C-alpha cells in the first residue's frame, strides 16, 4: 500500500528506492491533527479546550467485515483537564448521543484503566520486560478466549505460576465498582490506590447522573492502544456491532 507525493512531479529516474516516491498519506484519524492544532495554538485557546469534529479518515487495512479503507469518524476531545470530570463528560456526551440515535438498541460501556492493567500483571509476577507482550495477548481475549490467552502467554515463555494467577484474578474480579474497589485493595502494594479510586468515582458519578439507559461494566481485559494511551479506557459496544466507539486518556 503506497501513496504518492502530494502535488509534486515524480522523478522516476533519480529515485533510489520506492519510498522516495511516497512521503505523504491520507489522514489516518482526527486526533493527531487536533494535537498539532492545539500545540500550535494553546496560548490562545481556552483551558480546558473542548473539540467536536467529524470527517473522513482512511486506513490501509484489507477491507472486511467491520473494517473499511474509508469511513467517517466523529471525535469529541477534551485537552488540558487532568481530572476525572473529563472522562465523565465524555462518557455522558457519548451515551446521550447514542441514546438519541438508537433509542431501541441497548448498548454497554466497558471501562478500565491502563494503571490497573499494569498493576494486575505486576501482582501476578510478570517481569517489566514482558508487560507489553502480556497486554497484547490479553487484548485478544474477545477473539481467542481464556484458553487462547493462556496458551499464548505460556508459548511466550511466561511462568505457569504467573499465568495461572493472572487468569484466576481475571475470572474472579466482579465487573462493577465494587470489583474495582476490591481489586484496588488486592493491588495496593504494586499500584497507586488513586487509580482504582478514580475509576470508581467515574463509574459511580456516571450512573448517578446519566439520563440514558445503558450498561456500565468494569472490564479488566479491555486494553487497546498499547503505546498511545496512558490512563482511563472506555469502549461502547452493541449487540450485532461489537465495539464501535471508544475513548482513552493520554497524559503526554
Region spans (language model):
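Active-site nucleophile/metal-coordination loop of metallo-enzymes that catalyze phosphate/sulfate
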Residues: 2-25, 29
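Positively charged, Gly/Ser-enriched RNA/tRNA-binding surfaces
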Residues: 16-21, 29-43, 49-104, 152-252
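Short acidic alpha-helix initiation/capping motifs at coil-to-helix transition points
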Residues: 110-112, 140-144, 160, 194
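Extended alpha-helical scaffolds
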Residues: 101-104, 114-117, 130
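Acidic, His- and aromatic-enriched active-site or binding-groove loops in soluble protein domains
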Residues: 1-10, 125-155, 238-241
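Short, conserved phosphate-binding/catalytic loop or strand-edge motifs used
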Residues: 68-74, 111-119
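Glycine-rich phosphate/pyrophosphate-binding loops
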Residues: 107
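Short glycine/threonine-rich loop-to-helix capping motif typified by GTGT followed
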Residues: 118-128, 227-234
